[in-house]
């Protein structure tokens, strides 16, 4: 069994909590700020998608293969790493089918937002919060275990997930705010959904801490890589394309990949 210091655990949990709290930031944009610039939102979503795809394929999947190789051999390491990567995508596909994530964020300009239709809006807000909360559990696990093994990988991933969480906070806050006219309720609903990430991380660690090994790390990282790639391709990039009015999606995608690539190089040189 691998030994993990309590300092690393608390660091990983803090990073995961910070990423989850970004949903609250999204709700603040609804209740206090003006309507967000759709082109900037498109760029930000694509940036997060590019960052998540790059770090998943270049670092997390490689760590899965390396961990399996240390536990077995190079041939089995590559095989098991690939299989768990595909298994991660299959897992999140099943979750997505059982608890569909609302891909179309509601807008304050939507004709559904009328004073005589608050019951409908309240139901939409509840369903949106439940769906996004369910999807936040695997994201919390991804951030936690990536940071636990290597902050150089976990922190950039947490940054990408935090960007991804901002529009999720907006998606929850819009129907709640217009159903209740209460800023506190809108902020609280978004924040509680984001807290699913550190809660999911804590539950995952408690379940796996007694059996942590190279093989377990390999399986966790393989699944995480698959989940992150699926989320980027299924949620972030399509959402970015919806808001884009030009080439913001491809510019954001390339910028996200480039930024993560440079940050990982700098982390390598900064490491002792």
UniProtKB/Swiss-Prot annotation:
Any one GO cellular component localisation term in the record: plasma membrane
Pfam families assigned to the protein according to its UniProt record, in alphabetical order: Zip
Keyword tags: Cell inner membrane, Cell membrane, Ion transport, Iron, Membrane, Metal-binding, Transmembrane, Transmembrane helix, Transport, Zinc, Zinc transport
Subcellular localization(s) per the UniProt record: Cell inner membrane
UniProt keyword annotation of Transferase present: no
Keyword presence, Transmembrane: yes
Superkingdom as given in the UniProt entry: Bacteria
Binding-site positions, Fe(2+): 136, 139, 165, 168, 197
Protein's membrane topology: Multi-pass membrane protein
Catalytic reaction annotation: Zn(2+)(in) = Zn(2+)(out)
Regions that span the bilayer: 12-32, 40-60, 76-96, 126-146, 158-178, 187-207, 211-231, 247-267
GO terms of biological process kind: zinc ion transmembrane transport
Binding site for Zn(2+): 139, 164, 168
GO molecular function, one term: metal ion binding
Family note: Belongs to the ZIP transporter (TC 2.A.5) family. ZupT subfamily.
Described purpose of this protein according to its UniProt entry: Mediates zinc uptake. May also transport other divalent cations.
UniProt-listed HAMAP family: ZupT
Name recorded for this polypeptide: Zinc transporter ZupT
Lineage of the organism: Bacteria, Pseudomonadati, Pseudomonadota, Gammaproteobacteria, Lysobacterales
Gene assigned in the entry: zupT
């Amino acid at each position: 069994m691998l030994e993990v210091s309590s300092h690393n655990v608390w660091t990983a949990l803090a990073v995961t909590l910070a990423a989850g709290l970004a949903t609250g930031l999204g709700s603040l944009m609804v209740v206090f700020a003006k309507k967000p610039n759709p082109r900037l939102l498109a760029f930000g979503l694509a940036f997060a998608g590019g960052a998540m795809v790059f770090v998943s394929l270049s670092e997390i999947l490689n760590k899965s293969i390396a961990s399996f190789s240390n536990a077995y051999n190079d041939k089995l390491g590559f095989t098991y790493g690939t299989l768990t990567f595909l298994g991660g995508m299959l897992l999140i596909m099943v979750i997505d089918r059982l608890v569909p994530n609302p891909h179309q964020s509601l807008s304050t300009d939507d004709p559904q937002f009328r004073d005589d239709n608050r019951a409908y809006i309240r139901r939409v807000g509840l369903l949106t919060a439940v769906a996004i909360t369910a999807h936040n559990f695997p994201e919390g696990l991804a951030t936690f275990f990536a940071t636990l093994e290597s902050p150089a990988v976990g922190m950039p991933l947490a940054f990408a997930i935090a960007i991804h969480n901002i529009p999720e906070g907006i998606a929850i806050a819009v129907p709640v705010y217009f159903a209740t006219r209460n800023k506190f309720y809108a902020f609280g609903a978004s924040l509680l959904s984001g807290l699913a990430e550190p809660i999911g991380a804590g539950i995952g660690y408690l379940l796996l801490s007694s059996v942590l090994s190279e093989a377990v790390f390999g399986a966790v990282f393989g699944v995480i890589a698959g989940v992150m790639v699926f989320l980027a391709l299924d949620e972030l990039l399509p959402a970015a394309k919806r808001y884009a009015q030009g080439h913001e999606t491809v510019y954001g995608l390339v910028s996200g990949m480039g930024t993560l690539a440079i940050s990982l190089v700098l982390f390598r040189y900064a490491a002792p």
